[in-house]
Amino acid sequence: MAKKSGSGLQSSAGLMRYYEADKNAVQVQPKVVLIVGAIVGIAVLFLSAVNGFWP
């Protein structure tokens, strides 16, 4: 039987592309997401109260 050579490189090629894309992605800390979400929520509540949509 013939041995398969080079099969390890093909299986790891997808992982290498994933990690390269991950390095190029925008890095956002979880604190920033929570703070922006809280600010947007407060702004929505404030604007709805000002416009008379308060429950």
From Swiss-Prot:
The chain crosses the membrane at residues 30-51. Signal peptide: none annotated. Residues 1-29 are cytoplasmic. GO terms for cellular component: plasma membrane. Keywords: Cell membrane, Membrane, Protein transport, Translocation, Transmembrane, Transmembrane helix, Transport. GO terms for biological process: protein transport. Pfam families: Sec61_beta. The keyword Membrane applies. It is found in: Cell membrane. It is a single-pass membrane protein. The keyword Membrane applies. Belongs to the SEC61-beta family. Component of the protein translocase complex. Heterotrimer consisting of alpha (SecY), beta (SecG) and gamma (SecE) subunits. Can form oligomers of the heterotrimer. This is Preprotein translocase subunit SecG. It comes from Methanosarcina barkeri (strain Fusaro / DSM 804). The lineage of its organism: Archaea, Methanobacteriati, Methanobacteriota, Stenosarchaea group, Methanomicrobia.
